[in-house]
């Protein structure tokens, strides 16, 4: 947000590098939340139930809404029941067993999401605390791909 109140949203090629420089990110549950946590970017994750029949879920149930007449109602019921089973919807929160990523759930409006994101953006203590906690959560995994590749190369050379 610039001084005159206008909002600039850049188009970037390397999203995670841009996210690492962001003060806060707004996203949906998924791999991006883990990536944001790894670089220490606090985020607000949105699980909108405005149209639960359109939510993508793993496995064949994702296509349930395509069944004529009753499919959408069945998928709505399955998605809302499934969502209630879990305390958290984002992997960092599941791994930490506490809320590090702010999760918004339910019927969401752009205004509500923006209001919450702006409140967090103005809360320097929250931003700092969440950034440190998220960075620490996956610290031991930093460099895992390099270690794995080195292990594979060592095995190949041993053969």
Question: What is each of the regions a protein language model found here?
Answer:
Residues 1-159:
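Nucleotide-activated sugar donor-binding and catalytic core shared by glycosyltransferases
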């Amino acid at each position: 947000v610039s001084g005159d109140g206008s909002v600039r949203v850049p188009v970037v090629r390397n999203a995670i590098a841009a996210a690492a420089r962001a003060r806060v990110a707004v996203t949906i549950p998924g791999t991006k939340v883990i990536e944001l946590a790894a670089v220490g970017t606090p985020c607000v994750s949105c699980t909108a139930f405005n149209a639960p029949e359109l939510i993508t879920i793993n496995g064949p149930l994702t296509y349930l809404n395509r069944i004529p007449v009753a499919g959408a109602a069945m998928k709505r019921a399955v998605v809302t029941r499934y969502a209630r089973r879990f305390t958290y919807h984002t992997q960092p929160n599941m791994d930490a067993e506490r809320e590090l990523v702010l999760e918004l759930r339910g019927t969401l409006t752009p205004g509500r999401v923006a209001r919450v994101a702006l409140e967090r953006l103005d809360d320097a203590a929250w931003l700092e605390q969440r950034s440190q906690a998220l960075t620490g959560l996956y610290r031991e995994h930093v460099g895992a791909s390099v270690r794995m590749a080195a292990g594979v190369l060592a095995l190949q050379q041993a053969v």
